[in-house]
Amino acid sequence: MAKLVLFSAVEGTITRNGTPVAGAKVTREFLWSMKRETGSDTTVTDAAGRFSLPEITRRSLMAMFPHEPVVRQTITIAAGGTSYKAWVYFKRNYDDNGELRRPIRLSCRLETEPVGRPASYDEVFGVCDLG
């Protein structure tokens, strides 16, 4: 059975008007359409506004059969009583770093409006710049 990367590792920083946001809650969620599996994990930013989340992987014999991989990915930031969409993306492969074809490094500025940014196969929507 091959390793299937549903969500690559993520690193990032969160700021508001250039000031690091310490103690922000970062929640990552996924929906793997092939198995209708959902999952989530959470971390909190440090004093410098930094956070990291490890990759999420699975193994499956079913993945050896022809199908279109689709994993809905979201990252939400909760800070100061407000929720921000940091990352909304539909991953269409099981590759490590397959979202951007490079490691996911986010620079999230809470004072900005969420916008779409080009990614490997589609757009990533959110308040974070892709490093």
Q: What is each PLM-predicted segment?
A:
Residues A2-L4, K35, A63-G131:
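Feature of secretome-associated and extracellular-like proteins
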Residues S8-V10:
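Structural beta-strand segments of beta-rich domains
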Residues T13-V21:
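Structural motif
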Residues R16, R28-W32, A79:
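Residue-level signal for short segments within beta-strands and strand-turn junctions
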Residues A22-G23, R28-E29, R58-S60:
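A short acidic/small-residue loop/turn micro-motif
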Residues K25-T42:
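Short amphipathic beta-strand segments in non-cytosolic proteins
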Residues G39-R59:
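Glycine-centered loop-to-beta-strand initiation motif
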